[in-house]
Amino acid sequence: MIHYLIFPILLIFFQIIKSSGYYVPANGDDWTILKPPSCKNKLPGQYIDSLPFTFGIVVNPYILNEDGDYEKPIVSKIKPSLTTTTFVTSIITTSTATAPGSKPTKTKDIIVQIHDGQVQKMKHKHDYSSGGGDDDDDDEDCFDEKNIDMAAKRDYQDMNTQEQANEDSGQVLAESDSHQQVVDQNQQINEEEEETQEQQMQEENNNTNEIEDNKVQEFETIEEIYDDIDNNESRPNNSKKYHKKRPHNNYENKHGHKDYHEDHHHNHRYKDHENGHEEDDHKWNKPKPMPEQEEQEQEQEQKPKHEKSEGYESEFVSPVYSVACYTNSTLKMTLTDGILRDSDDRIGCIVSGHQFQFDGPTPQHGAIYAAGWSVTKQGQLALGDSTKFYQCASGDFYNLYDEPIAFQCHPVTLDVVELIEC
């Protein structure tokens, strides 16, 4: 009788455990295979599946043209730089004078995250049709009117051309950046002096070779050379040369003219100024390369290893060209092998309702995509080979989706930004 009572209790207990595993993928399948089919269409080298730093995303809406159609935002072409960035007032500048320009700071439309893992973009005051309210109530709001105005000014500066951005950045550079430019100028001057010295040494070597050739012509004329050939052919041992004009016994040097080398102090061995080789080691070496060849060799040495040899793992070049100030609510993400994670180590995925959110430690049951994320060379977040997402209004904020779910959805791109303390 007791056995009959225990069996229903165990059955109910197992049903409770099964229902509590809502976030576990069905049948224990590997959720990392939940990738968009378009991942196969990604062009090699145009998408980066891993980033070595924490980043955020900023909404960049599509532009509505005169015909009522949405056009993709124009991506400004920025030359990537391998240099480390340093924060200076509101501008991020590279640490070398050869930097293509400063990184714009974006504080508007940055994506935030709430406690349950959903990602949102807060609506600004200018997003509403009617304003109002007490200004004192907005003192603690991250998106108050003052911050919005400052963000609008910065966004306006970001829309200017790269040349205007360079001019503006020159007005806000700190004293440390000016000192860095002076150091870079001194370094450039030193490099120019070294190149000048190398050219002078090359000219001296060329002049020395011309003098030697002229001396050879003075002592060895064409008639003497022909006489030597005839005399050597008539002798059984023709390994030694004898001139009619002057014997060559016990002459050590290259041209066989001891007087010439004594006059020019070449009767002794000398050390090479760079490699420490003796003169005899350079007798049959190839001529020294010209300055153009030396520059090409230096450029080849300075090239990354992946450009020298095929199959070598390429050096990392960051595709992120902008930065943003982060707060406690800012969405902070990492990207590793196509998988997004937030600061709580939850998985970035597209759930069954096509909403972009973070769940974990495993994706939500019924999730559509949980992998296949990347960053394009233009610094945009991509899912598969697509950089197009949708922001859909929901009260005082927007949610993000990979497909439009209602009429209040608008296409956007998600620009990746480095997160910094401000």
UniProtKB/Swiss-Prot annotation:
Residues 249-284, 300-311 have a biased composition (Basic and acidic residues). Residues 158-169 have a biased composition (Polar residues). Residues 179-214 form a coiled coil. GO terms for cellular component: extracellular region; fungal-type cell wall. It is found in: Secreted, Cell wall. Glycans are attached at N206, N232, N237, N328. O-glycosylated. Extensively O-mannosylated. Disulfide bonds: none annotated. Keywords: Cell wall, Coiled coil, Glycoprotein, Secreted, Signal. Residues 1-21 form the signal peptide. Pfam families: PIR1-like_C. Disruption phenotype: Leads to increased chitin content in the cell wall, hyperfilamentation, and resistance to sodium dodecyl sulfate, hydrogen peroxide, and sodium chloride. Also shows an increased virulence in a mouse model. It comes from the Eukaryota. Induction: Expression is induced by host macrophages. Residues 238-248 have a biased composition (Basic residues). Residues 180-189, 198-209 have a biased composition (Low complexity). Residues 133-143, 220-231 have a biased composition (Acidic residues). Residues 116-143, 155-313 are annotated as: Disordered. GO terms for biological process: filamentous growth; fungal-type cell wall organization. InterPro entries: PIR1-like_C, Yeast_CWMannoprotein_PIR. One of its GO terms (molecular function) is structural constituent of cell wall. PANTHER family: CELL WALL MANNOPROTEIN CIS3-RELATED. Probable structural component of the cell wall involved in cell wall integrity and virulence. Belongs to the PIR protein family. This is Probable cell wall mannoprotein PIR32. It comes from Candida albicans (strain SC5314 / ATCC MYA-2876). The gene is PIR32.
